[in-house]
């Protein structure tokens, strides 16, 4: 860790300017809820009018789901040292079931706060942590089971229903192919009551720690839009606090719905505080990583007491969900012996080593109900880790993987007994024809708790391109019912990702998630596709760029060969040129049909050609031949 950089950060930290630039052609808008403090952000993309050559009409703006937070709102002054605006404190306080702690309940937190050498690293947080009052449960699942619709639930309903509301207004763009949802219960409209019922049933979670008041609420569940997670975090080999905050804001800009801080290097506690205070998206962690650092990396020295203190430490900071590898049981470890790649999960290998060293059952499993007590006191959601996931397609769907999954199903029911929100982590490396079995088995044994998968990677032959090998599997499992997809960057298996890698991974997974929404037939999912297709046909180049997931790259690729501004109104691109543009030719066919008195509305191009008066066309060609001298051949 570079101390001089950290000193600068704690005194004069500044946000990455690339992360706070509004998207070209877009503006941040807010939709008001039933109360003044429910303001749901969306990104509205302005569109040009259709050119007169194509009928000349107004194109209404298109609203899209926005994960970029206050960072792209020009009205919000971003100051990393102060953190993001408080959204949820009033909602939490009015429920009357929490108390403010006079001091941290974590021994480790108190030690860090008492260490003067860390002063230059600390985020200047004046607010004290909250916890449930004795005997109280503050989870969104607990409220949902009691029939309470929280402000978080209303916020989410507005956010998820955004495209549905707009579709009804846009006429020609509202056509959508029926999907195949594989038994998902996707309604025609997302209401606050539907959100409540899905959370109560355990089919969806709202990761929203009561100490993460900067959070813009979101939901993870198979009957909602497919979400994606981006990973950040330092390591022993490098990266500063400043770089991790930068990766957070950058990932959220491009579409990360949640972010996991997987730091394993120095100053994990301080790094996480900076991240959470400047994050509007849910933050997840793997607490066993930090617990391992506390015992100098020696897995055998881990204890329940150290792990418990780590959970409290992170819950007080505001971590929204914990990956906990409680399903790695002693009896499953021998099942991995003949695998090609053994145990590839860091958390899984840590717990397997502990189990073998002590020849005792996993303490995360034996203390699971005590963990639930901590989770419900702060509303931290479980992400039950797949510590025995396959690390190669050769090991996919084996006894170790599915044995652990069965145990995760048992633990899910225990968590639900405590009203603790729970999702299940999944593989991994799985060839395409074996992916659906994973989804079907998870739905069965985990009673439809949300599934959250890393990919899966569909082949192992493409280091450097694993964002693509996994994006294929992610799109498929998202279609089958997976609720959240954990991104993979081009650096997977090779190194720590930088900003460029983070963006590439996020965009790849946004494509996969959206493709899954289309395949499921999620209402309103096709609106953006239709708007972009219409812009493409009408050669509205700027609208094409702005409607895309990555306007910057689309614009740059176009400008490599046609850099002049005049090219952005041309009726062709560099792929086919002016004479061979299929869309230009199609429009000419339509124009000709109109001249012949053929109504082209709703007619396919093949039908259109057949309906043109062939005899009239032949006569026209005969006239041209005679006027040109009736010569059989002409010099060229």
UniProtKB/Swiss-Prot annotation:
Catalysed reaction, written as an equation: 5-amino-1-(5-phospho-beta-D-ribosyl)imidazole + S-adenosyl-L-methionine = 4-amino-2-methyl-5-(phosphooxymethyl)pyrimidine + CO + 5'-deoxyadenosine + formate + L-methionine + 3 H(+)
HAMAP family documented for this protein: ThiC
Single GO biological process annotation from the record: thiamine diphosphate biosynthetic process
Transmembrane segments: none
Enzyme Commission number(s): 4.1.99.17
Function comment: Catalyzes the synthesis of the hydroxymethylpyrimidine phosphate (HMP-P) moiety of thiamine from aminoimidazole ribotide (AIR) in a radical S-adenosyl-L-methionine (SAM)-dependent reaction.
Residues that bind substrate: 231, 260, 289, 325, 345-347, 386-389, 425, 452
Ranges for region Disordered: 48-70
Coiled-coil stretches noted in the UniProt entry, renumbered to this chain: none
Family: Belongs to the ThiC family.
Cofactor(s) this protein cannot do without: [4Fe-4S] cluster
Binding site for [4Fe-4S] cluster: 573, 576, 581
Protein name: Phosphomethylpyrimidine synthase
Pathway where this protein functions: Cofactor biosynthesis; thiamine diphosphate biosynthesis
Lyase among keywords: yes
Pfam families listed in its UniProt record: ThiC-associated, ThiC_Rad_SAM
Chain positions recorded as Zn(2+) binding sites: 429, 493
Cofactor: binding details: Binds 1 [4Fe-4S] cluster per subunit. The cluster is coordinated with 3 cysteines and an exchangeable S-adenosyl-L-methionine.
Keywords: 4Fe-4S, Iron, Iron-sulfur, Lyase, Metal-binding, S-adenosyl-L-methionine, Thiamine biosynthesis, Zinc
Quaternary organization: Homodimer.
A Gene Ontology cellular-component term: cytosol
Keyword field contains Zinc: yes
Superkingdom in the source lineage: Bacteria
């Amino acid at each position: 860790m570079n101390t001089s950089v950290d000193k600068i950060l704690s005194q004069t930290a500044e946000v990455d300017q690339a992360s706070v630039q509004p998207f070209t052609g877009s503006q941040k808008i807010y939709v008001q809820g039933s109360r003044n403090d429910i303001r749901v952000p969306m990104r509205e993309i302005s569109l040009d009018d259709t050119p007169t050559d194509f009928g000349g009409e107004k194109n209404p703006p298109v609203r899209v789901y926005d994960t970029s937070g206050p960072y792209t709102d020009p009205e919000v002054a971003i100051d990393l040292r102060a953190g993001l605006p408080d959204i949820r404190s009033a909602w939490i306080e009015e429920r009357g079931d929490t108390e403010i702690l006079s001091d941290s309940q974590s021994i480790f937190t108190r030690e860090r706060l008492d260490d003067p050498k860390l002063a230059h690293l600390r985020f200047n947080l004046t607010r004290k942590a909250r916890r449930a009052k004795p005997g109280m449960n503050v989870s969104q699942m607990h409220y949902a089971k009691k029939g309470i619709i929280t402000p978080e639930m209303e916020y989410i309903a507005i956010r998820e229903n955004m495209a549905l509301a707009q579709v009804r207004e846009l006429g020609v763009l509202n056509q959508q192919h029926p999907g195949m949802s594989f038994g998902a219960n996707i309604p025609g409209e997302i209401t606050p009551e539907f959100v409540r019922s899905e959370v109560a049933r355990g089919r969806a979670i709202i990761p929203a720690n009561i100490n993460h008041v900067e959070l813009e609420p979101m939901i993870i569940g198979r009957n909602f839009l497919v979400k994606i997670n981006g990973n950040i975090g330092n390591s022993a080999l490098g990266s500063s606090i400043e770089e991790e905050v930068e990766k957070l804001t950058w990932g959220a800009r491009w579409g990360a719905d949640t972010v996991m801080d997987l730091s394993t290097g120095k100053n994990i506690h301080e790094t996480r505080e900076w991240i959470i205070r400047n994050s509007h998206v849910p933050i997840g962690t793997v607490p066993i990583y930090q617990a391992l650092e506390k015992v100098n990396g020696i897995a055998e020295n881990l204890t329940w007491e150290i792990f418990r203190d780590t959970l409290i430490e992170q819950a007080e900071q505001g971590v929204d969900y914990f990956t906990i590898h409680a399903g790695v049981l002693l009896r499953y470890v021998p099942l991995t012996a003949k695998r090609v790649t053994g145990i590839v999960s860091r958390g899984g290998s840590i717990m397997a080593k502990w189990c073998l060293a002590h020849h005792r059952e996993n303490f995360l499993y034996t203390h699971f109900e005590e963990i639930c007590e901590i989770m419900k006191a702060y509303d931290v959601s479980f992400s039950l880790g797949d510590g025995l996931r396959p690390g190669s397609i050769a090991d996919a769907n084996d006894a170790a993987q599915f044995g652990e999954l069965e145990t995760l199903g048992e633990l899910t029911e225990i968590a639900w007994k405590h009203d603790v929100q729970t999702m299940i982590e999944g593989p991994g490396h799985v060839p395409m024809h074996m992916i659906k079995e994973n989804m079907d088995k998870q739905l069965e044994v985990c009673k439809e708790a949300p599934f959250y998968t890393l990919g899966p990677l569909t082949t192992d032959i493409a280091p450097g391109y694993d964002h693509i090998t996994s994006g294929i599997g992610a799109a498929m499992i998202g279609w089958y019912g997976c609720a959240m997809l954990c991104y993979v960057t081009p650096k997977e298996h090779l190194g720590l990702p930088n900003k460029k890698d983070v963006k590439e991974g996020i965009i790849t997974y946004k494509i996969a998630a959206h493709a899954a929404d289309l395949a499921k037939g999620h209402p309103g999912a096709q609106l953006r596709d239709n708007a972009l297709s219409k812009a493409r046909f009408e050669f509205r180049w700027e609208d094409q760029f702005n409607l895309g997931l990555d306007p910057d790259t689309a614009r740059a690729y176009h400008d490599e060969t046609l850099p002049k501004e005049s090219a952005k109104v041309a009726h062709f691109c560099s792929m086919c040129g002016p004479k061979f543009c299929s869309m230009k030719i199609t429009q000419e066919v339509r124009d000709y049909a109109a001249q012949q008195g053929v109504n082209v509305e709703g007619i396919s191009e093949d039908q259109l050609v057949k309906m043109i008066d062939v005899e009239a066309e032949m006569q026209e060609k005969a006239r041209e031949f005679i006027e040109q001298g009736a010569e059989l051949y002409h010099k060229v």
